[in-house]
Amino acid sequence: MAASVEQREGTIQVQGQALFFREALPGSGQARFSVLLLHGIRFSSETWQNLGTLHRLAQAGYRAVAIDLPGLGHSKEAAAPAPIGELAPGSFLAAVVDALELGPPVVISPSLSGMYSLPFLTAPGSQLPGFVPVAPICTDKINAANYASVKTPALIVYGDQDPMGQTSFEHLKQLPNHRVLIMKGAGHPCYLDKPEEWHTGLLDFLQGLQ
């Protein structure tokens, strides 16, 4: 019998801005840890709901929360803390995590969201249990010393039809503790092209985290 899942949505206040979120939780028992899902420029938290990722994570025992980034989705009215393509202060995602009371989450970060996740990942004292970059932008804006200082285990994901995935991997492979999932025949949003492979790879990675 499939485990029950509770789903809800709402808004949080982050640095004076209202941000929309969707959440899925295990219907019973304590969640193992939290997973924060970010998104690309043409997407939103709805992507993760429609794909079934929120549901699959909650079924597997995780608290899964997807936010709509500032200026996008249902957070359209919120002003972004940095122009698109520039690194946002790491304090922005730290404030999101605090507002949602996530504890240190695993962060899933496709495409545009790299401008938020990479400064958060590499901030001094950052202790994320896991990081799943999916061809994120801004990988060239983090220096080698900052990559080398990251203790967080990473699952680097990209489609082999995505030139940006290969480019970002050239930088992300400097993360000391990483493994790679390359999806054959998949493009930039590789999780949409190969949802089963995405979910299997993601859940397998999470299972191995402490």
UniProtKB/Swiss-Prot annotation:
GO cellular component terms given for this protein: cytoplasm; cytosol; extracellular exosome; nucleolus; nucleoplasm; nucleus
GO MF, any single term: hydrolase activity
Active site feature: 111, 162, 188
Chief place of localization: cytoplasm
Cell compartment(s), UniProt: Cytoplasm; Nucleus
Record-listed E.C. numbers: 2.3.1.-
UniProt catalytic activity: L-lysyl-[protein] + acetyl-CoA = N(6)-acetyl-L-lysyl-[protein] + CoA + H(+)
Entry annotated with the keyword Magnesium: no
Tissues of expression: Ubiquitous. Detected in spleen, thymus, prostate, testis, ovary, small intestine, colon, peripheral blood leukocyte, heart, placenta, lung, liver, skeletal muscle, pancreas and kidney.
Residue(s) carrying Phosphoserine: 91
Keyword terms: Acetylation, Acyltransferase, Cytoplasm, Nucleus, Phosphoprotein, Transferase
InterPro entries, per database record: AB_hydrolase_1, AB_hydrolase_fold
One annotated GO biological process: 3'-phosphoadenosine 5'-phosphosulfate metabolic process
Positions bearing N-acetylalanine: 2
Family assignment from sequence similarity: Belongs to the AB hydrolase superfamily. ABHD14 family.
Subunit structure: May interact with TAF1.
Function in brief: Acts as an atypical protein-lysine deacetylase in vitro. Catalyzes the deacetylation of lysine residues using CoA as substrate, generating acetyl-CoA and the free amine of protein-lysine residues. Additional experiments are however required to confirm the protein-lysine deacetylase activity in vivo. Has hydrolase activity towards various surrogate p-nitrophenyl (pNp) substrates, such as pNp-butyrate, pNp-acetate and pNp-octanoate in vitro, with a strong preference for pNp-acetate. May activate transcription.
Classification via PANTHER family: PROTEIN ABHD14B-LIKE, PROTEIN-LYSINE DEACYLASE ABHD14B-RELATED
Official protein name in the record: Putative protein-lysine deacylase ABHD14B
Lineage: Eukaryota, Metazoa, Chordata, Craniata, Vertebrata
Name of the gene this protein is made from: ABHD14B
